[in-house]
Amino acid sequence: MKAILLVSHGSRIAKTKKEAKKLRDILKKRSRVSIFEYAFLEIESPGIPEGIDICVQKGASEIVVLLNFFTSGRHVDLDIPRIVEEARQKYPKVKFKITKPVGRHPGMVDLFLEMIK
């Protein structure tokens, strides 16, 4: 069973967690994926390892790590892949995929142009 784990950075600002949860809720409803969780790289909980554990406990055999990050950087290029690799070792029967940062999506140009109208 496919699961999506929406991964955000995390922040000490309380509204950040609410925004991530709201985004997850909207995506879950529109995607119709039954296992759709969220996690944070740091500061907030659940952390990425806990989010992966939750997905596996709910029956995931495949987890798509959906990056709520705009560009590449240390977290996207090093930290998150390292955490996912640790999860691969822990759950060898689970398939993992990490998406590209949102900013690499070709639709971002149109979105930005719409925002500045």
PLM regions with names:
Residues M1-K117:
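Active-site-proximal alpha-helix that buttresses catalytic centers in soluble enzyme cores
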